[in-house]
């Protein structure tokens, strides 16, 4: 229940009162069965977050930051988890800076979390590097289009692990564990950990080995095909009928 917190706490608390469970994957449905949920109340639909990309991602989207990154290999970064605060986050950021300093065609855009501790570390570790832009948090439309414009994603966030693969973007997860094991198994995600050398090595591999990049970017997203909301609506209509 504590890992990841508060997401797992919220999931279990809501699950106690829910009469229907719409699971994004079969593995998630199996987990609900192990918790004792009624199998007749569990439906595998995919994740509605993938559906949203059909409405938020646009070919004509304009943002000055993505314009700045045109012609480069853009890495979108997010980092904010409380378990990474302190030294783990510093190591993560140092690995990213090392990549930028080594590869002159790489630029980084990092919408920095509002947590003052995160901002302090980001300023200290990324300061003075003109190919790393620290920007204010983006809204969902802006961020989805940032992901689309990116070459790869480096994150410790949860939902991004499901959304980015739907856009064909490899995801390096800067954590030691993930609650999205389906993505790792499918090959859309790779756990890079929180050690500087490990993160640097995994990122460098994606930048220098086209076949590995291709396999990750073309892997099938296990979290749905963008039709979860349609499936849920049909289920609800049949229940109400």
Roles of regions detected by a PLM:
Residues 1-110, 115-241:
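Nucleotide-activated sugar donor-binding and catalytic core shared by glycosyltransferases
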């Amino acid at each position: 229940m504590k890992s990841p917190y508060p997401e797992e706490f919220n999931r279990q608390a809501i699950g106690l009162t829910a009469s229907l469970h719409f699971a994004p994957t079969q593995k998630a449905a199996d987990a609900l069965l192990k918790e004792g949920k009624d199998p007749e109340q569990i439906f595998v639909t995919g994740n509605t977050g993938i559906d949203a990309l059909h409405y938020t991602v646009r070919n004509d989207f304009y943002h000055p930051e993505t314009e700045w990154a045109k012609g480069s290999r853009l890495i979108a970064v997010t980092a904010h988890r409380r378990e990474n605060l302190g030294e783990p986050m510093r190591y993560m950021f140092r690995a990213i800076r090392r990549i930028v300093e080594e590869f002159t065609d790489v630029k980084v855009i990092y919408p920095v979390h509002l947590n003052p501790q995160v901002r302090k570390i980001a300023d200290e570790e990324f300061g003075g590097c003109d190919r790393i832009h620290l920007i204010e948090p983006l809204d969902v439309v802006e961020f989805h289009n940032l992901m689309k414009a990116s070459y790869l994603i480096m994150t410790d966030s949860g939902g991004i692990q499901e959304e980015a693969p739907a856009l064909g973007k490899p995801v390096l997860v800067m954590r030691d564990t993930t609650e999205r094991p389906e993505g790792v198994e499918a090959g859309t995600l790779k756990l890079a950990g929180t050690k500087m050398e490990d993160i640097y090595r995994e990122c460098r591999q994606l930048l220098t080995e086209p076949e590995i990049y291709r396999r990750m970017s073309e892997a099938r997203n296990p979290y749905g095909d963008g039709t979860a909301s349609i499936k849920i609506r049909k289920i609800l209509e049949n229940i109400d009928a």
